[in-house]
Amino acid sequence: MTLQQEIIQALGAKPHINPEEEIRRSVDFLKAYLKTYPFLKSLVLGISGGQDSTLAGKLSQMAIAELREETGDNALQFIAVRLPYGVQADEQDCQDAIAFIQPDRVLTVNIKGAVLASEQALREAGIELSDFVRGNEKARERMKAQYSIAGMTHGVVVGTDHAAEAITGFFTKYGDGGTDINPLHRLNKRQGKQLLAALGCPEHLYKKVPTADLEDDRPSLPDEAALGVTYDNIDDYLEGKTLDSAIAKTIEGWYVKTEHKRRLPITVFDDFWKR
């Protein structure tokens, strides 16, 4: 088995999908989990206004609405969480995503004060954060807020990770990578677009340039610029296509280098890192 085949198998990626079937699969998956643990009453998700959180949010709201109708349990709710750092540059996109999703409840937690307080506490301890590490602080603060909300609403935190992010480890460890349930796992980036199109999402929300937008020195830095490859490259790789060797090497390099992000904390029984 080639490394490409190994990666595709590990991430559950498929070269072709039926969008309607995958929508149903994700919604039923979320419903089944909640039905298995009836003490859970909410799905909690941070909404940024980008493709991934818009899709995960819509699927979550669909799952909650269907389950509420089926069970008569009106305590069930989907909570969309706005998590700006100060003023969000693409505020209108976030509002448009909320309008599309129609969540049961919308909360806004501005993380800037908490991040600055953490940065100051570290500074007083003699640790001066780089802009990159401050970006990771933002991602982790967002997840901290979501887990606090989930803890107070008997909920689980929904993730937005998908195959095209997982393969490169393009997420913050214990930040946006630290979630309870990931309904998009297995899908590549273009397949996510197909699901949103089938759901009637406004095109500008899934055709916009993807960005984590975590760094102050490089605001709205495109994911593709940070990775050195395009999402089309990554999607082609995940679909089993043959790529230019340099591009394939870059993608595989990211996969190997970030394997620790896709694992639980390393123990003496683990040997994946020795490859």
UniProtKB/Swiss-Prot annotation:
Keywords: ATP-binding, Ligase, Magnesium, Metal-binding, NAD, Nucleotide-binding. ATP binds at residues 46-53, 160, 189, 211. It comes from Salmonella paratyphi A (strain AKU_12601). It is an enzyme of class 6 (ligase). Pathway: Cofactor biosynthesis; NAD(+) biosynthesis; NAD(+) from deamido-NAD(+) (ammonia route): step 1/1. Mg(2+) binds at residues 52, 165. This is NH(3)-dependent NAD(+) synthetase. Belongs to the NAD synthetase family. Deamido-NAD(+) binds at residues 140, 173, 180, 260-261. Catalyzes the ATP-dependent amidation of deamido-NAD to form NAD. Uses ammonia as a nitrogen source. InterPro entries: NAD/GMP_synthase (IPR022310), NAD_synthase (IPR003694), NH(3)-dep_NAD(+)_synth (IPR022926), Rossmann-like_a/b/a_fold (IPR014729). It comes from the Bacteria. One of its GO terms (biological process) is NAD biosynthetic process.
